[in-house]
Amino acid sequence: MPADPTTALPLRASYEAVKTGRPFDEDVLLSVVFGSHTPCPDDQRCLHIDLAPLAGAACIEVWRGIGPVRVGTAGQVRYAEDGAHCAGWLSIEEEAVGNLADATQAAYRSLLRFQAESPYRHVWRMWNYVADINAGEGDEERYRQFCLGRARAFAAEMADAQAIGYPAASAVGKRGSARTLEVCWIASRSPGITVENPRQVSAFEYPREYGPASPTFSRATVTSDRLLLVSGTASIVGHISMHAGNLAAQIEETFRNIDALVERSTAERLIKPTPLDQHSTVKAYLRDASDAASVTQELRRRLGPSVPVLLLAADICRSDLLIEIEVAHQG
């Protein structure tokens, strides 16, 4: 049976070595294996994503709850729940519904309906993996079409989402993969508090020049456990991409944005003023794999040796952005 949520431990993330042939621990809600050649354990809680790891040994991103978990399926949604948290995931073939916008709308309507009918009504964090995310011109660019489908789903299933606060989220591009949209998320019985970045226009308020529908996510969420979940963050000030072609400057600007979110969360007493440490996780998506060594060196210079870092090859939502970074930090 799921554990008693009144005695819940904090939700937590880690990067762990791949252990084939061994079952996951009973408190694992979700595990994400990256790379087409990395084996995925035979466990429903394991999701395989075709983004290549760029540094170090293959590893699994593991999200742990309070355990033991119960797994199940509801329509297209697979899930694991522990009494306090729920992890869900689904995939949908674009061809089955026509195009990416329609596939995204269908996927999000399914997951939002599932969450509305479950006791875990509050979605804290979402990840979206989109094939060829930068393909297409103008409003036909695939990321813009993804945003259109997502916005339509929120409007249909959760009209008050902006007032409540959109979940923190990332959307990155897979390369050379079948056109299958993959979405996973973490939800809870307890609401989180969304945090916006004073250096940036909120994504859901972007002007029309970025597409027919604004991206519907918040810059960060702080959970009821004081876990700061920073969305995929890049070199954007206001709503404008900065430092085109300059990776070092983009990294600098990205960390200014992450620091601003940490500072706001601390100022509002949502988290304690603690630095990133061995209990935090940092994931960086890098457009050009040949930059992996220099980026790893720079991240270590900034973060020190103890902060777990995962570097993945991926396309970023805007074609002029070279890197995107997300963080989970227990404050």
Predicted regions and their residues:
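N-terminal presequence-like segments and the immediate start of the first folded domain
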Residues: 1-256, 260-280, 285-331
